[in-house]
Regions:
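Non-catalytic terminal extensions of ATP-dependent helicases
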Residues: 305, 324-325, 408-411, 415-759, ...
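Conserved two-lobed SF2 helicase motor
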Residues: 130-146, 302-316, 322-342
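Conserved segment of the helicase C-terminal RecA-like domain
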Residues: 347-350, 354-357, 362-407
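Helicase-associated low-complexity/disordered flanking segments
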Residues: 1-64, 90, 270-301
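Conserved interdomain hinge at the start of the Helicase C-terminal
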Residues: 227-253, 260-263, 317-326
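Conserved P-loop/Walker A NTP-binding site and adjacent catalytic elements of P-loop NTPases
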Residues: 38, 42-229, 247-272, 307
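Conserved C-terminal RecA-like helicase domain
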Residues: 93-95, 103, 110-119, 255-330, ...
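A short beta-strand element within the Helicase C-terminal
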Residues: 154-157, 330-355, 384-390
Length: 855
C-alpha cells in the first residue's frame, strides 16, 4: 500500500478525463517532464536509458516492442504509456494472460492513478468499465476488437507477457488485436520474445502508424551465474543457505512435488533463529483455518514457503508478502513463477529440465527456461543472481555411490551405476548449457476461426464475411493454415445461414451487409458463454419437483469449467467403493476391471442436458464452440451437508483447496447472476446465500484488497463482483446464509449418526468435548432406544431445527437445537450447542460452546 499522499498522485498530474477544470491534450514534452518528474520525486527511481527511449518512442506515436530482461522495468514503461493516454484524452488498455495478473495490475494502477481512472474487466468482474484505463484479459480485448473493429475506443494497448502470442490454444487473442485495430498504438512486452522481426513487419504493414521500435538491447540489471549439481536437493538448498544465496525458489513441475520438497526441507535447518522469530511475529494474526493452511503454517515457521495455483489466494499472497519482506529463505513452488508474480528471489533451483506438457514428458524449451531462470537476482540487493539445475535422481544416486567409494579403485569397480528408468526423458550438463546459451524460440503465430468470432464480426455491421477473410489473409499464418481457416469460415457462415441466425442485405456499392436475426448477449463469449443456454434449459425443470433447487444447481454446474483435481478425487472414491462392492459380490478380477472403467464421477441430469444442448446448438450455432460438462460439486456438498473443510477431508484434496474455492466462487456468481429471481425457490435462495457466506469466510482477500484501494461509495458493489459480498456493520453479515451453514453442519451430524460413525463424529466435535468415546456412548444409548435415525425430508424440515438469537448482539452467539427424527417419532433426542458467531463467520465452519447430544 502507498501512503495517503502517494495514492492517485500520478493521476492528479493528468487532465481530468471529462476535461473540466484542467488543461487538455498536453504536449509530448509536458507529458515526458511530468511523468519522469513523478518517477524521480515520488517513486525515488532513476530511470534507465531504455525506459526513457521506450517512452519517448510512445510519445512520438510509435509502436514499441519491449523485449527486455526480467527486472528491467517494463512496468514503468507501461505506466508511462497509460499516463500519456490519460494526458491526451485516449483510453488505454493493459492486458495479461491470467486473471490474477490482471487483478494485481488493477490494484497497482488504482494506487497510482486513483480509483476513478482505472477499471477492470475479466469476464466475471466488471469494475468501473468506462474508466480511461482498463485492465483485462487478452481474450476480452480480442473479442472487443472483433465486435467493434475500427470503431473501438482503444487508443493504446500494453500487452504484457506477449510471448503468449505463440501459445497454441490462446495465441489467437494476442494476434487478433494487431490485425483488427489499425487505429491503436501498441506496447508489446515480454522478457522472452526471441526474434520479433516478423511481428514488427506485420504490425507496420497493417497499422495506421507504420513505425515500430524494437528495444531489445537493455542490459540485465542483475547478471546471472549458473551451476549444474549432482548434490541431492536438500544439500543444494542447505549450501545456498549457508552461502547467503537466499531467498531461494525451488522450481517444480507439479504441485505435489513442490509440497514434498518443502516438507523435506523443513527439517534441514534452512532458516536462522532470528528469521523464524520474525516469521512467527509476521504471521501472528493470520488465521490458517483450512487443512492445507495448517500445513503451510508449520512450513512457514521453519522458513519454507509454498507457492502454486492450487492454494487459496490469501495463502499465496501471504507467501508473496513474506518473501517481499525478506522473511522467507526458501519457497517451493511451480513454474507459475515465470508469469509475472512479484516475488524477490536471489537463487532459482530447477528440480528438473523436463516437464509434462499435457500429452508427454519433454525437455524445457529455451523460452520456458529463460522465463523461470530470469527471475533470479534482486535488483537493488544482489550483484548477481544464481540459477542451479539439479541432475536427474538416478545420476545423483550414482554420484552418492561413487563418493562413498572414496576413490578406492576396487570399491569403484563394484559400484553398480543406475540407469535412467525406461521411458524417462533425461537431461545432463550439456542440456543445461544449451538452454543457457539458447535464445528464446521465434514465436509461432496461432489463429482460429470460431462461431463466436464470426458473430462478433457480424455484430459490428457491414460486410462481416469480407472482414473475416481479411483477418485470415492479413494474419501471420502459413498459406496452408490460411486455406484451412477459410474453409472453416465457409462452414461457420453456412451453418449460420442455414439456421437463419444471420442474414444479408445487398448494398448499393455491390457489397453485402450482414446482420443477426437475434440478440447476442452483451457479455457474450466472455468467461460464462453458456449462460444463455442455462436460462433456456431452466424451462425444462418442474418448479414443483422436490429436487428443483438441486437440479438448477446441476444445470449451472454443467456450464462451469471443470475443477479437475476435485473430479478426479470423486472418481477415485467412486471406483474404490465400486471395487469393494464387486469384491464382496464375488466378481472375478477381469470382470471387476471391465466394470471399473465405466465408473466416473457423478453427472446429474447428463442425458437431459445433452439432449437439450444438442437442440440448443442447432438453434444457436455459436454454442458449437463450447461444450457442457455435467458434474456434481455444489450439489454434492448440499446433499451431504458438507462445509468446505469437511468436503476437503472427505475427498483428501487439501492440496487443491484453492481449486475448489475458485469453483465454488464461480458457482456462486453463476447462480446469483444468471438464474432470474422468478426461477428461484426458497431452497435455492438458501443455497445461494450459503455459498456466499462460505466463499467469503474461506478467503475474503480480493474483497479486502478492494476495500483498501481508496474510499468510494460504490465499494461494496464493486467488491461483490470480485468475490462474495463484503462485511456489513452487523454481528451477522448474511443471516440467511449463516443459518443454512449451521443447519447443514447440524444435519451432517445426523447423517453420520445414521451411518453409525463415531470416529467421524468425534473428529468433528472433539474440540467442544464430544470426541470418539463420547460419541460411541451416545450412539450406544440412542440405538438402545431407537431402531434408526431418519435422514429424509422430514428429518431436515425446519420444524426440527430451532434457533434462539437473543444473545446475538451482546454475546455474539446463537443457541441452536437439531432434533433427531427417530424411528419411533418420539423426537426426544437432540444435538444442542451455542454457536460462536464471530469464529463461525471467520472460518466458514460452525464453532460451538456448551455442546451436547442427549435426550
Amino acid at each position: 500500500m502507498t501512503d495517503e499522499k502517494e495514492y492517485g498522485s500520478l493521476g492528479r498530474l493528468a487532465p481530468e478525463w471529462d476535461g473540466d477544470g484542467r488543461e487538455r491534450n498536453l504536449t509530448a514534452d509536458d507529458i515526458y517532464e511530468r511523468f519522469f518528474g513523478w518517477v524521480e520525486d515520488v517513486k525515488g527511481i532513476e530511470p534507465w536509458p531504455h525506459q526513457e527511449e521506450a517512452i519517448m518512442d510512445l510519445l512520438a506515436g510509435d509502436h514499441v516492442i519491449l523485449n527486455t530482461p526480467t527486472g528491467s522495468g517494463k512496468s514503468l514503461v507501461a505506466l508511462g504509456m497509460h499516463f500519456a493516454a490519460l494526458c491526451t484524452g485516449r483510453r488505454s488498455y493493459y492486458t495479461a494472460p491470467i486473471k490474477a495478473l490482471v487483478s494485481e495490475k488493477f490494484f497497482d494502477l488504482v494506487e497510482v492513478f486513483g480509483r476513478d481512472n482505472v477499471g477492470m474487466i475479466t469476464g466475471d468482474s466488471h469494475i468501473n468499465a468506462d474508466a480511461p484505463i482498463i485492465c483485462c484479459t487478452a481474450e476480452i480485448l480480442a473479442n472487443q476488437a472483433l465486435r467493434e473493429g475500427t470503431h473501438a475506443d482503444v487508443g493504446l494497448v500494453a500487452m504484457d507477457e506477449f510471448h503468449y502470442y505463440g501459445d497454441p490454444e490462446r495465441g489467437w487473442a494476442w494476434q487478433v488485436p494487431l490485425l483488427t485495430l489499425p487505429q491503436t498504438q501498441f506496447l508489446l512486452m515480454s522478457a522472452t520474445l526471441g526474434n520479433v522481426d516478423a511481428i514488427a513487419d506485420k504490425l507496420s504493414d497493417l497499422n495506421d502508424t507504420p513505425d515500430v521500435d524494437v528495444i531489445a538491447d537493455a542490459p540485465r540489471p542483475v547478471p546471472l551465474s549458473y551451476e549444474y549439481t549432482l548434490d541431492p536437493m536438500e544439500k543444494t538448498v542447505e549450501l545456498a543457505f549457508r552461502n547467503g544465496e537466499t531467498p531461494i525458489y525451488v522450481v517444480h513441475f507439479s504441485q505435489d512435488a513442490a509440497l514434498e520438497t518443502a516438507q523435506a526441507l523443513a527439517s534441514t535447518g534452512v532458516s536462522s533463529k532470528e528469521q523464524r522469530q520474525a516469521i512467527a511475529e509476521a504471521i501472528k494474526g493470520v488465521k490458517f483455518t483450512t487443512a492445507f493452511g495448517k500445513i503451510l503454517q508449520r512450513l512457514l515457521r521453519t522458513g519454507v514457503g509454498i507457492h502454486h495455483a492450487g492454494m487459496l489466494p490469501r495463502y499465496r499472497r501471504l507467501v508473496e508478502q513474506l518473501a517481499q519482506q525478506g522473511l522467507l529463505p526458501v519457497i517451493c513452488g511451480t513454474d507459475t513463477l515465470g508469469v509475472g508474480i512479484n516475488v524477490p528471489i536471489h537463487s532459482v533451483v530447477l528440480t528438473a529440465l523436463t516437464k509434462f506438457d499435457g500429452t508427454k514428458m519433454r525437455r524445457l524449451r529455451a523460452r520456458e527456461f529463460h522465463q523461470i531462470a530470469g527471475r533470479a537476482g534482486r535488483m537493488g540487493f544482489d550483484t548477481e543472481g544464481l540459477v542451479i539445475a539439479e541432475a536427474p535422481e538416478y545420476e545423483i544416486e550414482n554420484q552418492k555411490a561413487i563418493a562413498k567409494a572414496g576413490g578406492d579403485p576396487k570399491k569403484l569397480k563394484k559400484v553398480k551405476r543406475k540407469k535412467a528408468p525406461e521411458g524417462f526423458v533425461t537431461w545432463n550438463q550439456s542440456t543445461f548449457d544449451k538452454l543457457i546459451d539458447a535464445e528464446p524460440e521465434t514465436l509461432v503465430p496461432h489463429l482460429k476461426i470460431t462461431h463466436s468470432m464470426v458473430l462478433n464480426e457480424v455484430a459490428q455491421g457491414g460486410d462481416a464475411r469480407a472482414r473475416i477473410d481479411d483477418l485470415i489473409d492479413d494474419s501471420a499464418q502459413t498459406p496452408d493454415q490460411k486455406e484451412h481457416l477459410h474453409q472453416r469460415a465457409d462452414e461457420i457462415f453456412q451453418t449460420l445461414f442455414d439456421t437463419e441466425v444471420i442474414e444479408t442485405e445487398d448494398c448499393k456499392d455491390g457489397g453485402k451487409d450482414y446482420y443477426m436475426t437475434l440478440d447476442m448477449p452483451d457479455d457474450f463469449a466472455l468467461d460464462q458463454p453458456l449462460s444463455p443456454f442455462l436460462l433456456a434449459a431452466l424451462e425444462l425443470l418442474d418448479p414443483e419437483s422436490d429436487t428443483y433447487a438441486l437440479d438448477v444447481i446441476s444445470m449451472a454446474e454443467a456450464t462451469l469449467e471443470d475443477p479437475k483435481q476435485v473430479l478426479r478425487a470423486q472418481e477415485r472414491q467412486a471406483r474404490d467403493k465400486a471395487m469393494a462392492d464387486m469384491k464382496a459380490d464375488g466378481l472375478d478380477y477381469d470382470e471387476r476391471m471391465d466394470k471399473l472403467q465405466e465408473i466416473t464421477y457423478p453427472k446429474p441430469l447428463e442425458d437431459m442436458l445433452e439432449a437439450a444442448f444438442d437442440q440448443y446448438r442447432h438453434d444457436v450455432p455459436w454454442a458449437n464452440d463450447y461444450w457442457l460438462s455435467p458434474k456434481s460439486v455444489v450439489r454434492d456438498m448440499v446433499e451431504t451437508a458438507s462445509d468446505f473443510t469437511g468436503y476437503i477431508t472427505r475427498y483428501n484434496i487439501a492440496r487443491s483447496e484453492g481449486t475448489l474455492l475458485r469453483y465454488l466462487s464461480d458457482a456462486y456468481r453463476t447462480l446469483a447472476r444468471t438464474v432470474p429471481p422468478e426461477k428461484r425457490d426458497e431452497q435455492l435462495e438458501d443455497i445461494i446465500s450459503w455459498l456466499r457466506v462460505l466463499v467469503r469466510s474461506i478467503d475474503s482477500s480480493l474483497v479486502d484488497e478492494w476495500e483498501n484501494a481508496g474510499d468510494s461509495a460504490d465499494q461494496s458493489e464493486a467488491a461483490a463482483s470480485l468475490a462474495a459480498p463484503g462485511k456489513k456493520n452487523a454481528v451477522v453479515e448474511d443471516r440467511r446464509g449463516l443459518i443454512v451453514l449451521i443447519r447443514n453442519a447440524m444435519f451432517r451430524r445426523v447423517q453420520l449418526m445414521d451411518l453409525d460413525q463415531p470416529d467421524k463424529l468425534g473428529a468433528l466435535d472433539k474440540d467442544w468435548g464430544s470426541g470418539v468415546h463420547e460419541w460411541e456412548d451416545v450412539l450406544d444409548d440412542y440405538y438402545d432406544e431407537h431402531e434408526y435415525v431418519g435422514i429424509g425430508a422430514e428429518a431436515r424440515s425446519p420444524e426440527l431445527f430451532m434457533l434462539d438469537d437473543k444473545h446475538e448482539n451482546d454475546e455474539h452467539t446463537w443457541k441452536v437445537r437439531q432434533i433427531i427424527d427417530d424411528s419411533d417419532g418420539d423426537h426426544d433426542w437432540a444435538i444442542e450447542g451455542i454457536v460462536d458467531l464471530d469464529a463461525t463467520q471467520d472460518t466458514g465452519e460452525v464453532v460451538f460452546h456448551d455442546y451436547k447430544v442427549s435426550n
